[in-house]
A protein has these predicted regions:
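Conserved donor-binding loop and adjoining core beta-sheet/short helix segment
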Residues: 21-26, 30-101, 218, 222-248
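Flexible, substrate/cofactor-facing loop regions flanked by secondary structure
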Residues: 159-243
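A short beta-loop-alpha structural element at the N-terminal edge
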Residues: 1-16, 25-29, 161-176, 181
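Conserved acetyl-CoA-binding loop-helix of GNAT-fold acetyltransferases
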Residues: 93-108, 250, 256-269, 273
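Acyl-donor-binding surface of acyltransferase catalytic domains
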Residues: 86-159, 298-310
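Conserved hydrophobic beta-strand within the GNAT/NAT acetyltransferase core sheet
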Residues: 118-121, 245, 279-283
Length: 310
């Protein structure tokens, strides 16, 4: 096996390999939308951070990553990077070996640039890719899931009010957003978030970059919310027929009473009426509350894994 820096002349072949990998995942998750081509593969040739693998002068895989950033993945002071779904691919034969050899070369590139942590989004049903990275010290951090925009069951809490919150009323649920942040700070999530970062996030979500649906009790108090956006964490989430959940919270005293399930049903029925066909969600796999809830109604299609290089 030989290796070259991923260049523009390799992009179309890399795109074909990436598309084959996506089609494999679609066999396991038929809800995934059809695509003609994998977008933005050229980024990993343009930034000089990609590696291509060859057997007998035929490309068998590639691996790239985004430009690094500081304080990545809550490792304060560390420079880290991420390889998205469109940033890698490998043929089926010898896939474990191909990915492991690619990572060896990619890690050398990263270390030379001072990049000390590396994350990559893998397809959830690609056992060979997961084996390759798990054996090399990676652990799961996040997951993306998808479902058809179809009912999950009749609303049980008929006494609750389900509605879309107007932008001017977003401050009503600021405390719930802060409670969600506090939940993610605790064990076993331990996601770091400074007061400044929290303030910036609240300003962003209250600026109108999303739609927010809420469940209200008989006293008018908001018991739960779900944020919806038109953008996902990967190219799949940008499909025009798809909408994505980007934040969910239910006050603790009303958990286990089908409040969040009923709100999700309301959201699904609303979006279906508007013509949307797919619903996605991403979450930290270190959040057991999210893990238990979302897997009941959604199917995994990605598994994002992370490790420190040095």
């Amino acid at each position: 096996m030989t290796f070259k820096k991923l260049s523009k002349e390799h992009v179309e072949e890399a795109r074909k390999i990436a598309l084959c990998n996506y089609e494999e995942e679609r066999l396991a998750v038929p809800e995934l939308p059809a695509v003609d081509s994998i977008p933005m593969v050229e980024l990993f040739a343009e930034n000089g951070l990609g590696i291509a693998a060859f057997e007998n002068d035929k490309m068998v895989g590639f691996l790239g990553c985004f430009e690094p950033w500081i304080d990545a993945f809550d490792f304060l002071g560390d420079k880290g990077t991420f390889c998205p779904l469109m940033g890698h691919g490998a043929v089926k034969e010898n896939r474990v070996l191909i990915y492991q050899k690619l990572f060896e070369k990619e890690a050398e590139v990263c270390v030379a640039k001072g990049i000390s942590s590396f994350a990559i989004a893998l397809y959830a049903h690609d056992s060979e890719a997961k084996q390759a990275f798990f054996e090399y010290g990676f652990g799961q951090r996040c997951a993306d899931k998808i479902r058809p925009m179809e009912s999950i069951g009749e609303i049980k809490n008929k006494n609750l009010v389900f509605e879309e919150l107007e932008l001017s009323r977003f401050p009503e649920i600021r405390n719930l957003r802060i409670d969600l942040n506090n939940h993610l700070l605790k064990s076993p999530c331990f996601l770091k978030c400074s007061d400044e970062e929290l303030g910036d996030w609240l300003e962003k979500v209250e600026s109108g970059d999303r739609r927010t649906f809420v469940a209200r009790g008989t006293d008018g108090k908001v018991l739960a919310y779900i944020d919806i956006t038109g953008e996902g964490e990967n190219f799949v989430g940008y499909d025009k027929k798809m909408r994505n959940i980007h934040g969910t919270y239910c006050v603790p005293e009303f958990r286990g009473q089908n409040v969040i399930q009923d709100l999700l049903e309301h959201v699904i029925l609303t979006l279906k009426t508007e013509g949307f066909e797919l619903l996605g969600v991403d979450h930290e796999s270190t959040n057991p509350t999210a893990n238990r809830f979302w897997r009941k109604y959604f199917t995994d299609y990605t598994c994002s894994v992370l490790r420190k290089i040095f």
